Curated annotation (Swiss-Prot):
The lineage of its organism: Eukaryota, Fungi, Dikarya, Ascomycota, Pezizomycotina. Belongs to the universal ribosomal protein uS3 family. InterPro entries: Ribosomal_uS3m_fun. Keywords: Mitochondrion, Ribonucleoprotein, Ribosomal protein. It comes from Emericella nidulans (Aspergillus nidulans). It is found in: Mitochondrion. Pfam families: VAR1 (PF05316). This is Small ribosomal subunit protein uS3m.
Amino acid sequence: MLNIIKSKIKNTYKKKALNDENVSFYNKNFVPAVRDWKNSIYVYNKNTLSLIPVASRLVMKLIKGYFNSYNLNIESKLRNKRLRRRYRKLSTNKIFISEGEFKHTNDKINITLYVYNKQKLNYLAKLKKKYTSLFGKDIFIKKLQLIKSKAIGILTQQQKKSKTLTNVLPKYSTKVNKIQNIYYRTYIKKSIKRLKYYMYYKQLLYINKAKFENSYLQGLIDLIKKIYKKNIEFNIINLKYLYFNSDIYTQPLVLKLRKKRDLLRYLKDLVNKAKIEKVSLNKRSEYYFNLENLFTRNNVDITNNLLNNLMQYNKKNSEYLKKVILNDIKYKRVSGVRLEAAGRLTKRYTASRSQYKFKYKGNLVNTYSSIQGYPSSLIRGNDKPNLQYTKLNSKSRIGSFGVKGWVSGV
C-alpha cells in the first residue's frame, strides 16, 4: 500500500527544477458537491436518482409557500383597499429564498437555505418612520395628558346629562346608557388609533419571526418527511444584503418586470444596490515537503505535535484561531455583479420585437487564478468556483422573458 501511495505522489507532484530538492505547492480550493449539483447523494439503486429532481422541486414549492404565507385578517386592517391575489404574488414585500442545497445521508437530509427577509425590513422601516420617533418625544406624553383631561371632562358632563334625562324620561334609562357607551368607545378608538396600528405592525413582525422557529417549522418538516421518508434538518442562513446570492438577486427583477415593464430603470436600481469595495489580494501561503523524507518514522506523528502546539498557543491568544479560520474562508467579499434581461419587454401592448439589456458592476474574473496564477478547480462544465449563476424565466401580458444573474466573489 505504501508503494502505491509513493508512486502516485511521484506521478502527480512534479518538481519545479531538477536540482531543487523541495517541492512547493499551493492549497487548491475544492468546491463542495452540494455547491456544484444542489444535491449531494449516493445510492445503491440508480433508479432512485431519477426521482430526486422531482422531489426537490416539490419540496422547494412547499418551502416557498410556507414562507410566503400571510395573515389576511391583520393586513386587511392596515389597508384601505383590498389587495388582489395577483398583485400580492408580484409584491416584493416578502421573504426571498434561494434554491435549496440538499445533502442526503442514510437517515437524514440537511437542507441549506439562503434567506433575505425583505418583509421584516419593510415593517421595521414603517415602525421607525411613523411610531418610534413619536413615542420617543415629549409630544406623545402631552397628547396622552390631553386625551386624559378631555376624557375626564366628557365623563363629568355626561353624568350630569344622564341624571337630568333619567329624571325626565325614566323609561328610557337603559337606552341612554347604551348611547353613552357607544360614545365612549368611539372616543377611545379615535384617540388610540395610531397605537392600534402600531400593535398590528408588531403582530406582523411576530408572525414573520415565528416562521423561523422550530415550533412552527415542525409542520413543514412533517410534510417533507412524507416525501423523502427521512429525518429533515434545516440550515437557514440570513443574508444581510440582497446581492450576496444570485438566486435572491434576480427574483425582485422578475417580479417587477411582470408588474411593469420598465427594464432599464429596474436594472440600474438593482445594480446600484451592490456595494463593491476595492479588495487587496493577499499572497497565499506555500507549504514545502521533501518527497524522500515524507514517509520516514520521524514525520509520522507530525500532525499530533502541530495540533498540540496550536492548542497551547490558543490558550494564550484565542484571537489567533479566529484570524486563521477567517483568512482560510474563500470568496468572502463580492467583487462584481451582472444582470441580463431579454424577451418581450417593451411598454406597448403589441407584438413588438424582443429587447435585450444588461448592466454590470465590478468584474466577474477569478482574480486569484487569472491575475496571480493560483490553481483553482472548475464546477460542472466550465463554471468558475468564484461565480454564482442563476437563470429565471417568466411571462407578462405580451409574452415571455428571461433573466440571468451573476455574482462573483474574491
